[in-house]
Amino acid sequence: MKVLIIEDETAAALNLRSLLGHEFPEVEIVAMTESIVETAEWFAAGGSPDLVFMDI
């Protein structure tokens, strides 16, 4: 499963990435973005996640 994490607090994003990697090793973090602009650019470039975590 491809996961996108959208979070402006770096520590929270890193904690989620670590937790997902530990509990669900089959999950692939395809991107971690910090803003709407960065996220929109990622999608415009062809990004296609299965699941999105936002503002956790």
What are these regions (language model features)?
Residues T10-L14:
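Charged phosphotransfer/docking patches of two-component systems
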Residues M1-L4:
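Non-catalytic signal-transmission and effector/linker regions of two-component phosphorelay proteins
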Residues R17, M32-L51:
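Acidic, metal-coordinating helix/loop segments flanking the phosphotransfer/catalytic sites
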Residues E7:
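Conserved acidic carboxylate
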Residues L19-E23:
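Alpha-helical interaction/dimerization surfaces of two-component signaling modules
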Residues D55:
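Active-site residues of response regulator receiver
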Residues F24-V30:
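A generic structural motif
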